[in-house]
Amino acid sequence: MGQGLGIKSCDFQAARNNAEHHTNDISSQRLFVRRGQPFTISLHFQAPVHTFLRALKKVALIAQTGKQPSKANGTQATFSVSSLGDRKWWSAMVEERDDQSWTISVTTPADAIIGHYSLLLQISGRKQCLGQFTLLFNPWNREDAVFLGNEAQRKEYLLNQNGLIFLGTADCIQAEPWDFGQLEEDVIDLGLSLLTVDNQVEKWGNPVHVARVLGALLHILKEKSVLPTAKIQTTEERALLNKRRGSAPILRQWVTGHGRPVYEGQAWVLAAVACTVLRGLGIPARVVTTFTSAQGTGGDLLVNEYYNEEGLQNGEDNRGRAWIFQTSTECWMARPDLLEVYDGWQILYPSALKGGEVLEACDLVPVRAVKEGIVWLTPAASDIFASINASCVVWKCGEDGTLELTDSNTKYFGNNISTKNVDCDCHEDITQNYKYPEGSSQEKMVLEKVQKYRMKHKNDGIYPPCCETDDPLHLFLKAPSSLALGKNVEISVNLLNPTDQEKEVQLAIGLQAMYYNGVLAAKLWRKNFVLILSANSAKKISTSLFNSNFEQSLPENSFLRLTAMATHSSLPCFAQQDIAIRRPHLAIEMPETAEQHQTLIALVSIHNPLDVPLEDCVISIFGKGLIHREKSYRVNSVQPRNTLRTQLKFVPMKVGCQRLTVEMDCNMFQNLTNFRTVMVVAPKSPA
């Protein structure tokens, strides 16, 4: 090579470079760097370089990616090694040199194509491969389209693998620990392998394109991999499928077929896995939960619900459904394809693939556009706007199939829109990013804007039908927002007759189990009353919900929906409340700090609130930096109203803030989880 000049070895200095590029948690052996930021390599020549001065004038590096690298589409770049560097293009400059070695600083463009690269040395036209590296997006670089200026946010939305996903109801938000695992080496490889389905490699430097492709492909993989409930036969299968530990095993299953299948009730899995892949490739991302969300409306701002005379759900609206909660993925980037005002958080909105165009199966909607009601900006903007701004209309279904509009308390969509707080393990309410305050002048202006657009282009409005009546009756339902299993609870219904006429009222109170997506799981209990309300009077009806009414019939991962239907001479009245189930609490006691390589003890306890024993109990513990592999322990049965306590020992391996997750499975419950964080410090040096 080069008239005798050859390379003895090349050191990519992976450990040092990865630390400087915030990728050291991915690997210390392979080179992972972020675009727009220099990295250093060392070349060691086979002979003193001063004897090959003519050849040295023609030294260049070649960086290439993809199956067929080409200068024409930007997948191959050739750049000379000099004492000067161009920070806006591929460049290399010699930082240090001696007789037989060079230390070279290589800089990539801030808009370079991401992916796996080969780096070659070219001397006098002859080429030699130096090795491979992986190039990622760079939120630390101001010139990168994914630049995020806040360091705490970069750590949370890019580097933090210990996530929380928020489930439950708007009045009882429940945190679910989630291991994103975006810094696992094979997770990044799997994310990049997904991209290879897309032939437009030249667009892999554009985070908008990359996010849309990944969103569409992950949605397709999810639909192929999710198992329907009917296929789940045994307790063991159900236990396996209900695991919600993290994204990595699910992604491996989706992409390679070697991993964990997914139970169809876990719709938040897609949002979590998408968040993992985006973070792994360098795009800041987070999982967002919307409580009470209108889904499947096609942009319509009305959702119809149907209940029978006993207040129990009766049929569904083909045009939409009210979900108790819905999860999505937000990612952070500039939008050069739109106006600058739409830079920032974008909502990944995948849908069913129609035809062969992958990009059409996933939209990327600016959060700002949703807040301002710009529903025509992108194809999915109207759907997302409707999901948090729709109105719900409740219809009473007669035995003969007739429908009657009810006077129902307004169900507000888009409540307590939540994501993990940057500074702590709790939820942050980001509703103000999506909506102006309820009843504000700004909200009114936005709704009027959308109303005008829909009347012009869709020939329909956004406001529900009027339910005013000359013979009113008011109905108020009072119940707790959550219910602990094993406990009875008092509920009450208040009826108010504001008229000068006596009323005969038929009151039906019903209890149902609902899945998070608004699908009826089971009808559990009902009670009927016939009441006489005097003119201008109020009456309170109290009753008890006994755990025996629902405890044995409650499906896994469901909620309680309490309803009240009051029928009288005029418009029926309806009220409802969703109640979250509080399963047995898995308590963890452990020190807040621990020493690396020293045994740490965690005390785990659980109380059985039921009248039957908890049997076949298995406790599992896992946590990056704390436990090398997941450990499982079979423990004693927990008798009714008794408490189980057990000690678990492990040795922390990594310094820093680490999370221990504890999970318990038994015959009555799957996936009872809790977590604690511990600060692991380096061992004290001997005096």
Curated annotation (Swiss-Prot):
> Any one Gene Ontology biological process term?
erythrocyte maturation
**Domain of life per record:** Eukaryota
Pfam families named among the record's database cross-references: Transglut_C, Transglut_core, Transglut_N
- Work out whether the entry's keyword set contains Transcription regulation: no
Give GO MF terms, alphabetically. Answer: protein-glutamine gamma-glutamyltransferase activity
Which residues lie within the region annotated Band 3 binding?
Answer: 31-39
SUPFAM superfamilies assigned: Cysteine proteinases (SSF54001), E set domains (SSF81296), Transglutaminase, two C-terminal domains (SSF49309)
The modified positions for Phosphoserine read S247
| SMART domains for this protein | TGc
What is the stated purpose of this protein? Component of the ankyrin-1 complex, a multiprotein complex involved in the stability and shape of the erythrocyte membrane.
Enumerate the PANTHER family for this protein.
Answer: PROTEIN 4.2, PROTEIN-GLUTAMINE GAMMA-GLUTAMYLTRANSFERASE
Assembly information from the UniProt record? Component of the ankyrin-1 complex in the erythrocyte, composed of ANK1, RHCE, RHAG, SLC4A1, EPB42, GYPA, GYPB and AQP1. Interacts with SLC4A1 (via the cytoplasmic domain); this interaction is mediated by the SLC4A1 Band 3-I dimer. Interacts with ANK1 (via ANK 1-13 repeats). Interacts with AQP1 (via the C-terminal).
Q: What is this protein called?
A: Protein 4.2
Query: Which species?
Result: Bos taurus (Bovine)
